[in-house]
Regions:
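Secondary-shell segments that build the walls of catalytic and ion/ligand-binding clefts
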Residues: 196-265
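Active-site cofactor/substrate anionic-group-binding motifs, chiefly glycine-
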Residues: 48-101
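Phosphate/diphosphate-binding glycine-rich loops and adjacent basic-rich segments that engage nucleotide
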Residues: 147-221
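Residues forming anionic-ligand binding surfaces in small-molecule and nucleic-acid pockets
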Residues: 73-79, 83, 94-110, 210-232
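Catalytic-core signal marking the mid-to-C-terminal active-site face
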Residues: 2-11, 257, 265-347
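Acidic, glycine/proline-rich low-complexity segments that act as flexible tails and inter-domain linkers
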Residues: 2-8, 13-32, 37-38, 46, ...
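A generic, well-ordered mixed alpha/beta core segment in the N-terminal half of proteins
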Residues: 80-169, 177-178
Length: 347
């Protein structure tokens, strides 16, 4: 399999121009591109530029509306609900977190939920927006059902990622993870590379372990049974109920509070209906932001310097690898996202 190496600036230019030619404004194209490129810079390739073709298809099919005008349908000093009107997820997500940040600066906390949206990229992008503003950020989203509940055999819940970011030194704390073992995007990458799935990731239509990526993806689309396991696998003994439960926590904050579509109804027919949740918390409402940041930074340092397991060189804290990956992929072209041509082939 051949690889093509790209400079970051080339990908940035391509991504912006592609979305602009599709029909988005220059400003909108930049927001969408920023979300995708941050994902690739952080090493989350499943949600990076490989999504561009999928978004284009969504627009062609009418799932994503270029002319959507998201509307705030409920508003208080600390909360809001937005109807995205089937618009691009990154655009409404960016706006929703901006609103949450402004409310948090004024009232201590801002919580915004969104319904009738589309895929919005990585949840961590929006949590990072709040952290970059000196606040504590949280974001989550539901998605088309891919998680099979514990003891079940039909996907009923999305990958339902949850992200949190907070200021710290020498780099911000950044956590972003799905509540499934892996995301659908990871399965798609294995499918496009003709690689079998690792054991413990997915289930077939009868609820048995499967390493067949094409079959699992086909069953997810057809709602024919099977899907991806919750964090913890498929058994309670390994903690399956915990990933299942976290998926439900995400679902509550996204689709229930917004009164939108639950994961098992997302992407039905000609509508996505994805729901998101955003939260910004102002640390100044709990004391000195600098003191809180210093206290957190001290604990993170203690974690990194705690005793290591035999054979291990270091202990990481969340956000450390993302910062290192970003620096590496911007400065060293040969280590930039290894886009391979098969990643773009159709299935």
């Amino acid at each position: 399999m051949g690889y093509v190496v790209y400079k970051f600036e080339m990908l940035e230019k391509f991504c912006n121009e592609a979305f602009h030619k599709i029909g988005f404004s220059v400003e909108e194209s930049k927001i969408i591109s920023d979300v995708l490129l941050l994902s690739d810079l952080f090493g989350i390739e499943s949600h990076g530029m490989q999504r561009l073709v999928r978004y284009h298809k969504g627009i062609e099919k009418g799932l994503i509306k270029l002319d959507a005008k998201p509307e705030v349908i409920f508003d208080t000093p600390v909360s809001a609900v937005i109807d995205a009107k089937d618009g691009m997820g990154q655009l409404v997500g960016h706006k929703a977190m901006e609103i949450a940040i402004e409310k948090a600066k004024q009232s201590g906390v801002g919580i915004v939920t969104v319904k009738n949206s589309n895929h919005y990229g990585i949840a961590g992008y929006y949590a990072k927006m709040a952290s970059d503003a000196g606040l504590i950020g949280f974001s989550a989203t539901n998605s088309e059902a891919i998680m099979v509940p514990t003891f079940g055999r039909l996907a009923m819940i999305g990958s339902n990622p949850i992200a949190m970011a907070a200021p710290a030194e020498p780099y911000p704390f950044f956590f972003d993870a799905s509540t499934t073992v892996v995301t659908r995007g990871k399965l798609e990458m294995y499918n496009k590379m003709d690689k079998p799935l690792p054991e413990g990731w997915a289930l077939d239509k009868d609820g048995h372990d499967s390493t067949d990526a094409p079959d699992v993806l086909k069953n997810i689309v057809a709602k024919n049974g099977g899907g991806i396991m919750p964090l913890g696998g498929s058994k309670e003994q390994s903690g399956s109920h915990k990933g299942y439960g976290w998926g439900m926590v995400c679902e509550f904050f996204c689709s229930i509070l917004s009164q939108g579509l639950t994961s098992n109804k997302v992407n039905q027919g000609n509508k996505s209906g994805t729901c998101h949740s955003f939260m910004a918390i102002n640390p100044a409402f709990f004391g000195s932001p600098e003191d809180i940041k210093a206290h957190f930074s001290t604990f993170l340092k203690e974690l990194r310097e705690s005793p290591k397991a035999e054979g291990q060189e270091r202990i990481y804290t969340h956000g450390e690898k993302e910062v290192a990956a970003t620096k590496d992929r911007k400065e060293n072209d040969n280590r930039w996202r290894k886009f391979s041509l098969p990643l773009w082939k159709e299935r």
